[in-house]
């Protein structure tokens, strides 16, 4: 049994570490931006999500999403659910900055967002970071 315990513990730990391997799923070498319209903000676990629509030069709409911090991390940084829902209101025009999916999907891991009125939300922020 002593031989199997380290193997069992390793098998449990590896999937947890893999889940948090942002660099595995996203190209962290290149920050991209996408300008669009907020469809929905989801205050959810394990990560909050921002859904927004982006039009290309031909007027075709592409549905994007941005993976954000977990609600518990946002709360620790001083953000509330109502603040986030108020900032990311459906219909608001937004420019989202993030690191795109290596698979080429219209998905980014979130870095920051800027609304047309100039207000900005940064993922590493705290109180006062919605400016």
List the model feature ranges, each with a label.
Residues 1-4:
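Positively charged n-region of N-terminal signal peptides that target proteins for export
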Residues 13-15:
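N-terminal signal peptide c-region/cleavage motif recognized by signal peptidases
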Residues 17-32:
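Short boundary/loop segments of OB/S1/cold-shock single-stranded nucleic-acid-binding domains
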Residues 36-38:
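Conserved hydrophobic positions within beta-strands
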Residues 44-55:
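Short aromatic-glycine-enriched beta-strand elements
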Residues 62-74:
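Short, basic/aromatic beta-hairpin or loop at an interaction surface
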Residues 77-95:
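Short nucleic-acid-contacting surface segments enriched for D/E, G, S/T with interspersed K/R
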Residues 99-126:
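OB-fold/S1-family single-stranded nucleic acid-binding modules
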């Amino acid at each position: 049994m002593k031989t199997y315990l380290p193997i069992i513990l390793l098998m449990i730990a590896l999937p947890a570490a893999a889940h948090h391997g942002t660099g595995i799923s996203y190209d962290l070498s290149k920050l991209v931006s996408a300008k669009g319209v907020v469809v929905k903000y989801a205050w959810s676990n394990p990560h909050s999500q921002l859904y927004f629509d982006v039009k290309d030069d031909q007027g075709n709409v592409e549905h994007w999403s941005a993976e954000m911090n977990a609600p518990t991390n946002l709360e620790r940084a001083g953000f509330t659910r109502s603040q986030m829902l108020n900032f990311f209101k459906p219909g608001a025009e937004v420019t989202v900055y993030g690191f795109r999916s290596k698979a080429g999907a219209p998905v980014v891991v979130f870095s920051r967002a800027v609304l047309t009125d100039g207000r900005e939300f940064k993922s590493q922020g705290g109180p006062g970071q919605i400016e």
